Amino acid sequence: MIQKNWQELIKPEKLQVNPGHDPKRFATVIAEPLERGFGMTLGNALRRILLSSLQGAAVTSIHIDGVLHEFSSIPGVREDVTDIILNVKDVAIRMQGDGPKRMVAKKTGPGVLLAGDIQTVGDVAILNPNLPICTLDEGAELRIEFTVDTGKGYVAADRNRPEDAPIGLIPIDSLYSPVRKVSYKVENTREGQILDYDKLTLQIETNGSITAEDALAYAARILQDQLEIFVNFEEPKRESETTAIQTLPFSPALLKKVDELELSVRSANCLKNDNIVYIGDLIQKSETEMLRTPNFGRKSLNEIKEVLASLGLHLGMEVPGWPPENIEELAKRFEEHY
């Protein structure tokens, strides 16, 4: 009976995801209903993980031709090096592989050096190419080399300085997290006649390297992984579910819908037009019956026979107890068993 501790708690069946004005960067996610107190517990934990623990990419150091340290000024460049560093920290980067990787930006004045002027390499992409880095006057020339790496959270500049750092290498603070802002609120919601359940609303903004919905999924997976060590027992399978499988007069695989068989469009449409919804419906048909279906030919027949054979099934089978009265409920219940 220990499983009642978690099985009888109410939980949301599906998340409601509302994209913002930029679906790649913004989303509002609503989870309801939750047991009283779980909204605050989950909201706070997910927010902390979103801001601190997701992998991302960032600039770790820069090297500017003719500059020895961050307190220098550059002839013909309106910003000093400290201002340039502040702007570089805001460059949003997506990098699929491992680092570090080096990129270069060159500019001749007059004009503004933008993040999009950085010459990317390999799988590196600049997500905010219109971000200004510095402004050059007439006749000024500038070359900056950027070192990019992957990591998580915030890393201070002193930790980004390699032991063999060359003269002129300027390490900078790195904010690897792809999540820029997270806020949440907990409100009352109802389930049936009970009014004191929690409704959790999360508002998430990313830098565009991942979607807000994916960021939340990764954060939830991290939390799940961290909690697994605290579970010191094997969860017994639900007795009712085991009994139901044993008493089912046919294989649960027959409850799978035929549109999940990855058939050709022609074959799938023929089955749909003949009101064949489940595999259990299909295997009871004979070859002759199938060939009577409009637009259904030998090619489609052979395709279906091949797919059924891969499942250990064939046309013309007898299925006792088919179709069950509650077929839709059974299909949903036994989905994980086929």
UniProtKB/Swiss-Prot annotation:
EC nos: 2.7.7.6
GO terms of biological process kind: DNA-templated transcription
Cross-referenced InterPro entries: DNA-dir_RNA_pol_insert, DNA-dir_RNA_pol_RpoA/D/Rpb3, DNA-dir_RpoA, RBP11-like, RNAP_asu_C, RNApol_insert_sf
Matches recorded under SUPFAM superfamilies: C-terminal domain of RNA polymerase alpha subunit, Insert subdomain of RNA polymerase alpha subunit, RBP11-like subunits of RNA polymerase
GO MF, one annotated term: protein dimerization activity
A GO CC annotation given for this chain: cytoplasm
Chain residue ranges for the region called Alpha C-terminal domain (alpha-CTD): 250-338
Region (Alpha N-terminal domain (alpha-NTD)): 1-234
Keyword Ion transport included in the entry's annotation: no
CDD domains given in the database record: RNAP_alpha_NTD
Reaction(s) this enzyme catalyzes, per UniProt: RNA(n) + a ribonucleoside 5'-triphosphate = RNA(n+1) + diphosphate
Keyword annotations: DNA-directed RNA polymerase, Nucleotidyltransferase, Transcription, Transferase
Pfam families assigned: RNA_pol_A_bac, RNA_pol_A_CTD, RNA_pol_L
Function summary: DNA-dependent RNA polymerase catalyzes the transcription of DNA into RNA using the four ribonucleoside triphosphates as substrates.
Assigned protein family: Belongs to the RNA polymerase alpha chain family.
Complexes and interactors: Homodimer. The RNAP catalytic core consists of 2 alpha, 1 beta, 1 beta' and 1 omega subunit. When a sigma factor is associated with the core the holoenzyme is formed, which can initiate transcription.
Record comment regarding domains: The N-terminal domain is essential for RNAP assembly and basal transcription, whereas the C-terminal domain is involved in interaction with transcriptional regulators and with upstream promoter elements.
This protein's name: DNA-directed RNA polymerase subunit alpha
Record organism: Xanthobacter autotrophicus (strain ATCC BAA-1158 / Py2)
